Amino acid sequence: MDWLDDVKWDAQGLVPVIAQEQGTGDVLMLAWMNREALRQTAALGRAVYFSRSRGKLWFKGEDSGHAQTVHEIRLDCDRDVLLLRVTQQGHQPGIACHTGRHSCFFSRLGDGAWQAVDAVLKDPRAIYG
Amino acid sequence: MDWLDDVKWDAQGLVPVIAQEQGTGDVLMLAWMNREALRQTAALGRAVYFSRSRGKLWFKGEDSGHAQTVHEIRLDCDRDVLLLRVTQQGHQPGIACHTGRHSCFFSRLGDGAWQAVDAVLKDPRAIYG
């Protein structure tokens, strides 16, 4: 498919992908996709990433139940970064982070240190237990 | 400085950085930082990236005038991605993209093709001329 060839995959065949929450505009996480992950994301309308640590496709929510419905897929001007507009499923408000928080970006720089400033919405042991 | 050591720099000494607009929540761009870029960003309160193509620090706005004032710096749960909350300077509405558009993510997937769906706000020749 031509549109998959338009993406500039890196040396590992990956691109970074930003997941932004529909409605709030909150940036939830950054993950990675390979060609097959992007193809499946577009086909299924749900986020499928490539797990670099596990070396395989990661159907977001397969363990946690916190899947992401994908409303829109965008590509940047250099064609090497993707932006998804998503609805985070399985909890209200949405939990994108494996720590049980809304967003993975819960640490803020202040007074020369990273400080966790966002609440844990659900105990990770209850998510993955 | 300890907080710089907390970041998990990749094999090239870099991390991806998402710039999100304060107020609108729009995702403007993704760029990269090395340790020195992050140190200067925090010290100056303006976005300083590392240009992978030029192999040196990139003081965002040095050519275009479209600098980014940084309100907040966040780190993700894996400590290998940064999120900036910024105000895009030099034009109203802000122009983050070298194509003269608000955001670098102006191409949307639809009908099996990437389609440019956001307007050019200023001719790039007028920005960089």
Swiss-Prot record, chains A, B:
Its cofactor is Mg(2+); Zn(2+). GO terms for cellular component: cytoplasm. Its main location: cytoplasm. One of its GO terms (molecular function) is magnesium ion binding. One of its GO terms (biological process) is L-histidine biosynthetic process. The keyword Amino-acid biosynthesis applies. The keyword Thylakoid does not apply. Pathway: Amino-acid biosynthesis; L-histidine biosynthesis; L-histidine from 5-phospho-alpha-D-ribose 1-diphosphate: step 3/9. Its EC number is 3.5.4.19. It holds the Pfam family PRA-CH. It is found in: Cytoplasm. Homodimer. NCBIfam families: PRK00051.1. Catalyzes the hydrolysis of the adenine ring of phosphoribosyl-AMP. This is Phosphoribosyl-AMP cyclohydrolase. It comes from Verminephrobacter eiseniae (strain EF01-2).
